[in-house]
Amino acid sequence: MDGQMNVVEHWNIAVQELSERDKILKNIISNYRGERLKLKSDGFLTLARAIVGQQISVKAADTIWKRLEITANGNISRSRIRELSTEELRKTGLSSQKTSYIRNIAESEVLGTDWDECSDEKITELLCTIKGIGKWTAEMFLIFHLARPNVLPLADIGLIRAIEKNYNDGNGMSKEQFDGLGQKWSPWCTVTTWYLWRSLDPIPVEY
């Protein structure tokens, strides 16, 4: 099981408001009507997938993830990861470091937190206490598991590339320019991020 659910309650209103205030984004959105962010109901899956995807291509990450699914007999869960040996995990293509990080997440008690009671900043702080999780991975958790509406992961190379391509003819941009766009897109930066990713990738980004 993949632990997926698909409901993002604020999606339609976000699309409407963003389309009204940003013509460039409106054109991007119009190219992908009927598509939207797919959420993961299991936060462990989001974190594990994000670890797998660190510093490698989407295609390479997808290949490793499929091997991991086979190794885990279709059940990538905290308990199943704890049962698998390091050798079994490494055979999927995971580096020793990523194997260690995924084990850390599987064993962490932080995932038992009531996230509804936490701000985005508090969630990021808690997740970053787990070795292997940094701000980017925490942001993927906020987007793909919790559907927090206003996440703009500016440490994400793909997002930076998409913004520069669509808003500055592929040329580099300053922090002030990125911050200005973030203010324009707020409070719907998550929806913006998804469509900008989608404008670059042949398949939707998923964590």
Task: Map each language-model feature to its residues.
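A general alpha-helix detector
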Residues: 46-51, 67, 84-88, 122-126, ...
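Histidine/lysine/aspartate-rich catalytic loop segments that bind and position anionic ligands
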Residues: 108, 130, 146-150
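Alpha-helical ds-nucleic-acid-binding substructure associated with the helix-hairpin-helix region
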Residues: 24, 28, 56-57, 61-129, ...
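Structural motif
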Residues: 37-45, 93-96, 182-189
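C-terminal accessory module of base-excision DNA glycosylases/AP lyases that mediates lesion recognition
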Residues: 1-35, 100, 117-122, 135-207
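A positional/architectural concept
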Residues: 13, 20-50, 55-66, 70-72
